[in-house]
Amino acid sequence: LPPLLALLLVAPGATPQRNPFAGRRLYVDPASPAARQAAAWNRSRPADAARMRVIAAQPQAKWMGDWARDVRREVDGVVGAAARQGALPVLVAYNIPHRDCGLYSAGGARDGDGYRRWIRDFAAGINRRPAVVIVEPDGLPSLDCLPLRLQDERYVLLRDAVQTLKAAGAAVYVDAGNANWRRPPDMAGRLRKAGIEMADGFSLNVSNFHAVQVNVTYGEQLSRLVGGKHFVVDTSRNGRGNAVERQWCNAPNQALGRAPTTQTGSALADAFLWVKTPGQSDGTCNGGPRAGEWWADYALELSKAAEAIGSMLPH
């Protein structure tokens, strides 16, 4: 959108907000799982290697959690590599205590104090260099599984994370689940308790499959309830836009979605991103390996489907 039109379309009463992605190229990891798979298949399966290169060519977020032995060093490595490319990295903080309600991606920091230390190490790795951080996918919409005491703690921890990451110079988006999870007034209340006023905005559809327009409509509704805050949408696997209720884990019959872009068609949507790594398993469901492990067959299925229907292109 032209800058003037973008300003005119901002929610009434909201302060026009800078898009941290504007004019920036996003970081592409040359050693991503898809890039390594393409190299492994280059001679034996050249057509499939080419499909892996389609995935590898796209900028994708780097996730940090309790598997990172030294989160400061790992974040520093990603942010430094991006700086050498002249690019903007997108990182995901995924280490909240009682993560994923004990399901496929269970884990996280042992307690609140451990999380505070971890998020400070994460922020130290950024060290006031350009970076975007998605804060705790599903952490807000799923907190009903916790007793009230731990719900209150989670809000405190998320507010602290937002404040700490902003102080390190990052652009911060607090995760707000997906359009079919929580109604906008409910989600807005959760975001306010989690410090959305300090953040750049919120993220939608992380690791999910809901259509772009469904997310944009929901995001615009939610934005109006949180002071006009902007949002980003994960389009990594929503090319078919046919999310089925309770089929969020390695859902079959999906496709790669829109390639990352700031050309979203909405003044409130800062970017479409690939937050989820296509081919990274959601868990031991629908034939997949453990959560977070690379699953080449699923990545190939997503790429083949996108090739057939053109779902990575604007539409």
Residue spans of the language-model regions?
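Acidic/glycine-enriched edge-of-secondary-structure segments
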Residues: A57-D66, L148, G169-R182
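Structural recognition of the beta-strand scaffold that forms the well-ordered cores
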Residues: R25-V28, A61-G65, L88-A93, A131-E136, ...
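N-terminal carbohydrate-binding/catalytic regions of secreted carbohydrate-active enzymes
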Residues: P20-G125, T277-I309
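A general structural signal for short secondary-structure junctions and capping/turn motifs
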Residues: Q17-R18, A81, T262-G265
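Secretory targeting and sorting signals
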Residues: L1-P16
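Surface-exposed substrate-engagement region within the catalytic domains
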Residues: G23, D29-I55, N180-A299
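Substrate-binding cleft of extracellular glycoside hydrolase catalytic domains
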Residues: W67-D70, G77-V172, D186-L191, M198
